């Protein structure tokens, strides 16, 4: 790899130059979006994306956590990290007590922005636990070809939109900016796939198709089902990771300890105690990643017309995804009071019914 006099690889300069030449969208200011390989991406993560595509060497033992932004990433990171490291750390002095889940599981899209940071991953012991917000189409070829395991979490699009809008407000505040993004404008951009990481529908479809084409490689989780049954989710997660809970662990309540450690309330309280700035770029504070940790908040933001439009887009985007198997559904079965419905023949990404959700909240089932 040829170096310049400043020590920066020549292709690094090329990546920076390439980013500045890509189509620009500033409707989410101060977040600048660039269109790269057909996908709108945050400008901040583009050099890292390019570096990862060129230099990252995946291993068959790697575990990759993938998600569309604001779909349950923080919770998934905490659960996976705690499950994989449960024999190394006691719950009383666990790393999650003083580290944010995003500090425990690095985001490939960001750390690859520095080749020095990317090279440090090469020295990490197996199995490496890494996360990404990249759609499947933008993943490094080494990830696609090495056979490493992928864990994907998706969320009802309307709730994802609302969560992203609130998170954007935190970005504006933490950067000391005054721009306010009207919800209606973000709604239009969301419908047009002009969002960081592109289309939520194409994002989910990419990993869903990988799941159906390579059985056993992808664990496809749904945020709302995680909320409804965290213990069941944790059991599936541990089995997929190859470290199922032993009879002794079940007897002494290890799974319950992990669920409690990674609960929304506990992680939020820990984040408020930590009270410091972390990634991306030191912009966000530890508590910025926690708001409600619930399903159904879209009802407080979307008009019936907005909700109907998103549901129509979802139905159109996911039409024909069954292909002889189970169909991916991202549309809520609970739109404006319709009866909750779920069958064993479909994989529904459902929002919990209001009446069921109230019970879940009282039992502390709402998670980050």
Please annotate each region the language model reported.
Residues 1-221, 240-241, 272-345, 352, ...:
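PAPS-dependent sulfotransferase catalytic domain
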Residues 86, 233-247:
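Non-catalytic, well-ordered alpha-helical segments in soluble enzyme domains
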Residues 201, 227-231, 252:
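Alpha-helix initiation and capping sites
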Residues 220-233, 237:
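C-terminal, well-structured subdomains that either form a transmembrane helix-short loop-helix hairpin
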Residues 243-255, 326:
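Short, surface-exposed acidic
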Residues 359-363:
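Short, intrinsically disordered C-terminal tails of secreted or membrane-associated proteins
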């Amino acid at each position: 790899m040829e170096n310049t006099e400043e020590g920066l690889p020549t292709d690094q300069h090329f990546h920076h130059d390439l980013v500045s030449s890509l189509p620009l969208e500033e409707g989410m200011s101060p977040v600048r979006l660039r269109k790269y390989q057909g996908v709108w991406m945050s400008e901040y993560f583009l050099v890292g994306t390019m570096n990862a595509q060129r230099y990252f060497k995946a291993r068959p033992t790697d575990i990759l956590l993938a998600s569309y932004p604001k779909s349950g990433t923080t919770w998934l990171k905490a659960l996976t990290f705690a499950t994989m490291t449960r024999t190394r750390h006691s719950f009383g002095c666990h790393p999650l007590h003083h580290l944010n889940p995003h500090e425990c599981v690095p985001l490939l899209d960001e750390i690859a922005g520095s080749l020095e940071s990317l090279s440090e991953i090469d020295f990490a012991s197996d199995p490496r636990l890494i996360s990404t917000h990249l759609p499947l189409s933008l993943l490094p070829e080494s990830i696609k070809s090495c056979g490493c395991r992928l864990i994907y979490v998706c969320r009802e699009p309307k709730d994802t939109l609302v969560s992203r809008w609130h998170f954007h407000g935190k970005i504006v505040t933490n950067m000391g900016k005054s721009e306010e993004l009207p919800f209606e404008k973000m709604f239009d951009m969301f419908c047009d796939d002009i969002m960081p990481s592109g289309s939520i529908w194409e994002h989910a479809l990419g990993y869903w198709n990988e799941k159906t084409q390579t059985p056993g490689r992808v664990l496809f989780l749904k945020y709302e089902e995680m909320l409804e049954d965290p213990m069941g989710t944790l059991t599936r997660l541990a089995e997929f990771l190859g470290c199922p809970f032993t009879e002794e662990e079940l007897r002494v309540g290890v799974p319950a300890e992990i669920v409690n450690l990674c609960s929304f309330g506990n992680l939020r309280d820990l984040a408020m105690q930590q009270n410091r700035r972390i990634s991306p770029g030191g912009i966000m504070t530890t508590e910025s990643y926690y708001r409600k940790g619930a399903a159904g908040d879209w009802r407080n933001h979307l008009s019936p017309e907005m909700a109907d439009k998103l549901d129509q887009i979802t139905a159109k985007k996911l039409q024909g995804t069954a292909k002889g198997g189970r169909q991916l559904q991202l549309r809520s079965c609970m739109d404006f009071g319709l009866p909750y419905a779920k069958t064993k023949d479909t994989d529904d990404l459902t929002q919990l019914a209001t009446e069921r959700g109230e019970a879940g909240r009282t039992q502390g089932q709402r998670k980050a």
